[in-house]
Amino acid sequence: MKLEKWKNKWKKWSNLRKWQIWKLKLIDARLYFVSIFVGLLTGLVAVPYHYLLWYFFDVRKTFFTAHYPWYWHVLLFFILWGILIFVASLVKRMPLIAGGGIPQTRAANNGRIRYEHPFKELVAKFCGGVLALSAGLSLGREGPSVQIGSYIGTLISRWGHILKGERKQLLAAGAGAGLSAAFAAPLSSSLLVIESIERFDAPKTAITTLLAGVVAGGVASWMFPTTPYHLISAVVPGLSFIRQAELYIIFAALMAVIAKFYSLIVPFFQERIPAMKLSIPVKMLYLLTIAYAISLTETNLTGGGEQFLMMQGMNGTHDIQWLTIMMLIHFVFTLFSLSSGLPGGSFIPTLVTGGLLGQIFGLVLVQRGWIGYENVSYMMLIGMVAFLVAVVRTPLTAIVLRSEERRVGKE
């Protein structure tokens, strides 16, 4: 009798245990399904963000190359000035939308800050980022896309009554989906979450981020089936192993030194310029004057400088002096743009700086007879990755992102 009683207890406990396991599996399955939904929504928001940036860049380039009368330039200048003042006022009211957004996303994921008004801040980040870059500032799209994704992940977790312990995983999934939507790169989006936001490789976080990234990347690939980076010819220098080792060691050391200087001077400007006792209209006037002057001379260098880099990669100049001047102008412009606190990331400007450094280094090697002109674009691509790794310190993300953007695996 006692044996039968113990058997019944064991059976009940076993059934309860199985049900608990199945319940956990159902919860995980629900989380994965919701992460797919987060990726879809992030793609539907971040991809139009990307499209609007390209659209306004084309509008701005058409205007500056059409040689309109001077009074049209005066009118446009005052319109852009008003836009920058409006965006700066948004940042003053909602400080979390300032800058790129990756530090804020990391802080929200780690519980150091809380998104109190995620929907309002999402709209403000979207509009502020588009308007700031439409004025030509040297900012990127990846940081805002990451933060937009984190806002969407937060909103879905609240609206969907997701368990409190799983909300940060949806926030991280949304952040990864944002990067995937910005560059159509789902693998690098997962790596970014692990290397920069989450900083540990929890399997559930990796799975949710990858699912959201694949869906968001699919939306981006549907909207932008090709990327301009695959048009850059990457011809590997035909050097011996020893000579290649010497070449890349020298290049790596040079990039590390410049990246260290870059990493020190950017925070210095970001601290000093906001501390200047100037009103917002005056600060925006100075910033817009620089942006407008560059737009009048070299429009491709504005808006982050990605178009200028593409032009150099496909049909670049051989004039080292001119290219060095353009790189320094872009660098100084980026410092002032990042120090403004307006919505926009540093990813694209950093890539452009690294790419131009790689091109200059390649042209120097051509003059010394180490490589040919056909290898300069390859050095540009290597420079982009090397400088990004040295500045951001996310090596896997940088390498995989470059490969995904060029749609090749051999790199």
Labelled PLM ranges:
Residues 1-411:
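Alpha-helical transmembrane segments and immediately membrane-proximal extracytoplasmic
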